[in-house]
UniProtKB/Swiss-Prot annotation:
The active site is at S56 (charge relay system), H96 (charge relay system), D122 (charge relay system). The keyword Endoplasmic reticulum applies. Belongs to the peptidase S26B family. Catalytic component of the signal peptidase complex (SPC) which catalyzes the cleavage of N-terminal signal sequences from nascent proteins as they are translocated into the lumen of the endoplasmic reticulum. Specifically cleaves N-terminal signal peptides that contain a hydrophobic alpha-helix (h-region) shorter than 18-20 amino acids. CDD domains: S26_SPase_I. It comes from Homo sapiens. This is Signal peptidase complex catalytic subunit SEC11A. The keyword NAD does not apply. SUPFAM superfamilies: LexA/Signal peptidase. Residues 165-176 are annotated as: C-terminal short (CTS) helix.
Length: 179
């Protein structure tokens, strides 16, 4: 049987202790947001950490791998580099390798991508009439990764009840934990 001792702990708290715990929770959330914003500034990427959601980049990256990105304007995009990009009309960014670069005489660069595990290039994924990606489409470039750590994110997206259970337990831990 599940022990509900934590409810007794919450009931025993006076208003000041409960207020302190809620304030603690707010500080944790604020700190996490500040760290995220700081990473955005340092890396130059709107999303400095992403999770690989499909097997299209195997064997380089597997579903659930956590990627660390940078997006420095001064760094040129190179063939073979792994980029994370957004396509207009799609919410989720895509992680694929640069296959070809098309450079115009004015210095404007366009490029074509492909997943390592895919048979064809990504032109079928781009919006209709678009044959190349531009630098403005890039969210970041992979600079490092941690294998399978992001599987928790995938589980939370695939199973919303799991997500709410984890968030509830984390919130409860912060409220009940004294220190």
């Amino acid at each position: 049987m599940l022990s509900l001792d934590f409810l007794d702990d919450v009931r025993r708290m006076n208003k000041r202790q409960l207020y302190y715990q809620v304030l603690n929770f707010g500080m944790i959330v604020s700190s996490a947001l500040m760290i995220w914003k700081g990473l955005m500034v340092i890396t130059g990427s709107e999303s400095p950490i992403v999770v690989v959601l499909s097997g299209s980049m195997e064997p380089a990256f597997h579903r659930g791998d956590l990627l660390f990105l940078t997006n420095r304007v001064e760094d040129p995009i190179r063939v073979g580099e792994i980029v994370v990009f957004r396509i207009e009309g799609r919410e989720i960014p895509i992680v694929h390798r640069v296959l070809k670069i098309h450079e115009k005489q004015n210095g404007h660069i366009k490029f074509l991508t492909k997943g390592d595990n895919n048979a064809v290039d990504d032109r079928g994924l781009y919006k209709q009439g678009q044959h190349w990606l531009e630098k403005k489409d890039v969210v970041g470039r992979a600079r490092g990764f941690v294998p399978y750590i992001g599987i928790v994110t995938i589980l939370m997206n695939d199973y919303p009840k799991f997500k709410y259970a984890v968030l509830f337990l984390l919130g409860l831990f912060v409220l009940v934990h004294r220190e």
